[in-house]
């Protein structure tokens, strides 16, 4: 198993983790989250960088929660050729029906505003680029499959997914992914997503995870809960 961190490593936004495993004699690839980089021109440029592989080669995406720095580039990924399922909780899917169209609208608005200022001779610097359209968002939403907390879901032969409650926002999850590669014992890979704090009124405490062979944990609250 190989894990490649394409964002949110040494930085806060742009959560994108690519996992490669060997199953039934061939290499399989999947993503955990596919978020947008946020925070100025440098972040905007990162959102335009090509992946080190073709999106068509991805088998599926596991999405921990709806925040844009974890989900916001999914329409771009799908527009570039990814056709597989995107797994998340029902609450996350309901939030994304609002957040992703809104993201497309804001991007288009930024471009339109810049074009008006450019025509008036008042624009300085690089022109913003819309990463995806409302139509591409609608196509992306059709690729989602809901997996609820505590439900075991086979994503591929040798890969099982279970979501636990992360207590971060509505629908947020800790993703438990059990992987049995060719000729190897099963390993549990746990992706924390963003973890909530204990004792909050509006959200439940994050679930406790008893064991993991590989743990990928966020570093804002991951050492406090």
Model-derived regions, located:
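Catalytic cores of nucleotide-enabled group-transfer and carboxylate-activating enzymes in metabolic
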Residues: 2, 6, 19-34, 180, ...
């Amino acid at each position: 198993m190989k894990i490649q961190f394409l964002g949110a490593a040494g930085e806060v936004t742009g959560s994108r983790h690519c996992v490669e495993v060997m199953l039934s004699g061939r290499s399989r690839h999947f993503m955990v989250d596919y978020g947008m980089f946020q925070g100025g021109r440098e972040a905007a440029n990162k959102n335009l960088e090509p992946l080190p592989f073709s999106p068509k080669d991805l088998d599926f995406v596991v999405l921990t929660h709806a925040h844009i720095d974890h989900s916001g580039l999914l329409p771009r990924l799908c527009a570039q050729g990814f056709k597989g399922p995107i797994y998340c909780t029902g609450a996350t899917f309901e939030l994304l029906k609002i957040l992703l169209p809104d993201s497309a609208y804001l991007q288009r608005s930024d471009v339109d505003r810049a074009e008006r200022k450019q025509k008036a001779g008042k624009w300085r610097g690089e022109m913003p680029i819309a990463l995806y359209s409302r139509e591409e968002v609608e196509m992306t939403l059709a690729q989602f499959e809901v997996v609820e907390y505590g439900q075991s879901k086979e994503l591929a032969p040798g890969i099982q997914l279970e979501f636990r409650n992360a207590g971060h926002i509505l629908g947020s999850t800790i993703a438990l992914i059990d992987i049995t590669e060719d000729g190897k014992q099963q390993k549990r890979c746990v992706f924390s997503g963003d973890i909530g704090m204990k004792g909050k009124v509006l959200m439940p405490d994050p679930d406790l995870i008893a064991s993991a062979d590989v743990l990928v944990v966020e570093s804002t609250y991951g050492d406090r809960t």
